[in-house]
Amino acid sequence: MEIRTTEQFDKWFRKLRDRKAKAKISARLRQCEISDHITGDHHGIGGGISEMRFHFGPVYRIYYTIDNDVLVILLIGSSKDDQSRGITEARKLLALYRGE
């Protein structure tokens, strides 16, 4: 499974100060690539967007979409505290990706 990221996701990930969280998130994404499917706690939130949940720290979330069953686009990340903002931003990014 190929995983691509948006600039917004990359910026969010770079700003994460919790090294353990970054390592756990990176490990899970590598596991998804290797196993060729989304692993761990995840579910659809509607409109073609799903979220991966990471139950440590402030409970991180990564919003993503799947394109053609092989490409995962990581739209943006957030914590539980700014979840609604993260979902709104993910919807905007998906619309841009789709050319809407």
List each model region and its residues:
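Basic, Lys/Arg-enriched alpha-helical interface segments
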Residues: M1-V59, N68-V72, S79-E100
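Short, surface-exposed charged micro-motifs
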Residues: Y63
